[in-house]
Each structure stands twice: as structure tokens, then as C-alpha cells.
Amino acid sequence: MKNQIKIPSRRYFKKVKQILFKEILLKNKGCEFNNLRRSIYGNEKILKLMTQNNIKVNEISSGVSDRTAYKGYLKQIISDFKKNKYYKNYYPSKGNLEARNALSIYENYKLNSSVSYSPDDFCLTEGSTGAITMIFEYIKKYYPNKEILIQSPNYYLYKFAADYYDLKLKEVAPPINANNPSFIPVDTIIKNITNTTKLIIITNPANPSGEIFSEKDLKKILLIAKEKNILVLVDELFAELVFEPDKYVYSDTIASSLNAMNNLVIVKGYSKSKNLVGLRIGYLYSKNKELTEAVALISQQRSSYSVASNFTGLIALDCFIQSVRYNSVSKIKRVIKDFQIIPTIKEKSYFELVKECQSYSKYFESLIKFYSERFDEAINILNVDAEIKFPKKSAFNTIVKIKDLDNVNNFDFMLNCFLTTGLKTEIGPCFGFNQKRWDNNLGFWLRLTFAKDKKLFKEGIIRFIEFKKIYLKNPNLFIKTNLSF
């Protein structure tokens, strides 16, 4: 095997151990898994030792894309800055009105005729993360003694936000069935609803499993939310990145049919679907006026005024393109008519807009094809080493249970894999809030992100499997912390 893995020297491990126990663990006395993992992966002394031992860093599960953004979006951003548009102004606390108008037009296409969004239903935020923290701050202010239920495993920031705002967060996870694995615990969520429940959080598509909620699932949750006056937060960050978009059901489509729009808030962002993570463009939207007005006040108090407003031209162009994709290219004239109130779209000719949609379509088809190939490649390489895997639904992430690691300390394996191969991994405890639940009975779970470099992604998975064999044969040659989470 090319660049065959070698177990580092005792001297190397001794130096790393000193840094780990005398510096990193002392600074992370609470031993929160994600903080500790990041402290190790980013420690300059450890990285220097790895470089000296010819160990190169690689990632297969970071959740950050290596793919480039659509060129049309980059051109729009550059053009707007050259024309001194948007960046010179302060905007309302909900964000630039042109951007919110464009978002309302786009999102309205999914609803029935009895209800529609207005620009006031939208708030631009600092990425989807900013939207999440504002919603939590709203709960803290208006419902401080209420409980939050969350689909688990899930994005770690929800736990961080709940801790920061001193809110009661209860994770809800189903039992794992190897023959029909699912991390979508709809019935379990409903069983755990009490009189103190105020917020239910679901991620659709799910992170990290990539599963998609069915129409039946969404109806169950929204009906009981309406009955008990509960707010449902649906994180749709990955909604555009599905392999079969015709089968994806939008939560507000269901809520509008159930007259439950007041019980729904949706969070979206441009980090994953547009490969624009560094721009921090996000937004939330809801027909719940108490929520949106509270978020506007929070934004005003933070004096953030959303940096996303600086990219209004990009947001407007994307809303137009996604609207055409949703309605089909044959209805582009209707969409152009609807968007005539949006300056960014109005100033473009019909032929420019048609060309933009065609160019984006080619870009997006290529992107999804790339993700699909990485998914198939990963499952093929893992082969029998993947004891449990999820169906191919969402294009960005999945998570697999790795065979033969049930009785291995998750943290120690992750740590030594990084120190030996340079491979950064995100594993089960990264997504489990009650981390004791990720015990030996559940096993070792590895998230895979398909948006990584093709060559490095393949090499990373191969090296992971090779390291597993070496580690299981020689456990005493590696660092042992015996930490559990």
C-alpha cells in the first residue's frame, strides 16, 4: 500500500501525551467532547510534532465543503461591490428589504393560496447559527421555564446554545435497529411532549444521517404542536441537497395545509447549499409575529444588522434561480414577472436570466453528481467495515456504524487515528447531547462529508480502515485516556 501507515514512536506519543494531559485537558476541565476535539485538532504544538513526523492532516467528516460556489453568484457579489451597492448602508434589524422581498417571493411558491409570506416574516441572520441562537434567546426571554425537545443525534450548536441561555434541552432518540436504522424519532418525540414543552427541533434532512422526514411524520409533529401551542423549529440547511428533490416535503407546505403556520419557524443558510460558508448568510422565517418581532429586537440590541444584507444581490439572484427550478424552466416568464419588484432581477434582461438559470442548472447537476459518486465510493470502500449505513437520501453527509469497534473507547480511537494518520474525524459523541448514550452498546459511528476533495476523501477512508486494523492488533502501543462522554 502506498504511504503505508506506521505506528509513531514512543517518544512522539510521550510528547503528545504531555501536551494533552498538562495543557489541553487542564483547559477543558468540563471535558465537553466537541471543545476537546477541536482543541486537539487545532493545537499548534501537536500539529508541529505531526509535521516533524511526516503526518499530514486530512478530513473526511468536517461538514465544510471543498467545492467552489457557483460563478454567477461570485460575479454578482463582485459586481455589487464594484457598484458600491449594499455595503455602504445600515439596514433594518430584520435585514435588507430587497433581500427579504426576494425570499418571500421564493418561499411563497410552496404554499397554498390561503396563506402567504410577507417580507416582515423574514429575518436575515449571521448564518443559520445566528438564526438558531436568536430563537433560543427568544425562548429564554418569553418562556424561560419551558422545555425544548430535540431530534438526536443533531448539530452540536443546539446544546451549546441551550447551555449558554440556561434552557432545559431534552434529546429524543429512537432505539437503533440494525435492519432498518433511523435517527428520526417522531413517535418518541410525541411521547416526550409535556405541559412544559415549548419548542421542538428537527433537522430535515437530518444531520448527520441524511434522512428525510416524510409527509406523515411532519403532519404528526405539526398537528400536536398546533394542539398544544408548541413552536416547531425546522432546520432546513440541507434541504436543496437531496438526491430525489421530488420526494422532499417542505414543512411549511404541510403547515399551511393544517393551518399551523403560527407553530412553525424555519432556519436556512447559504453555507452548505451554496458553498459560501465564510459569508455567513442565513435567515429564519415564520408567520409567528411574536417570534419575528422578538428576533428583530434581539438583532437591534446586538447591533448586528446582519452582514447578509451586504449580499442582497446574491440573495435576490439565488431566490430567482431557485424559484425557476421549483416551478420549472417553462414558467420562467411568470417568475420574472413576480420578481419585477426586485431591483437585482429587474435590471437583467430576459436572455441574461435564462442563461443564468441554465448555467446554474449545469453547475448544480455537476455538484450533485459529485456528491453521489463520493457517497457510492465511500460505501464501496468501507464495504463490510460499515456495519450499519443509511439509505442514499441527502447529498452532503451520512453516518455509518463501523464494525468491530463496539468495545473500543470512542475518544481514544479518534485521538490516536488523528495522531497516527492525520485524519480528523467527527464521530458519534459529536452529535449526541447526552453523550453517555454513545456507549459501547451503541458502538462507533463515523460521519462522512461528501463535499471533500475527491482524492483526499478516498485516501482518508482507506487510511481510516487501515488504521482500524492496526489499532485493534496493537492497542497497547497507543495513548489511552479512558475518557468517556
Predicted regions and their residues:
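N-terminal small-domain helix-loop-helix segment of the aminotransferase-like
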Residues: K29-G127
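Conserved glycine-rich beta-strand-loop-beta hairpin in the small C-terminal domain of fold type I
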Residues: E59, N154, N310-L314, V335-I379, ...
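Conserved core of the PLP fold type I
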Residues: Y86-I224, A239-M261, V265
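Helix C-cap/helix->beta junction micro-motif
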Residues: Y165, E227-K228, T421, Y471
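PLP-dependent enzyme catalytic core of the Aspartate aminotransferase-like
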Residues: K2-I5, L97, I105, Y109-Y117, ...
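Active-site PLP attachment segment
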Residues: I254-A294, Q301, V307-D318
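Charged, glycine/proline-rich intrinsically disordered loops and linkers
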Residues: I5-R37, D246, C319-S366
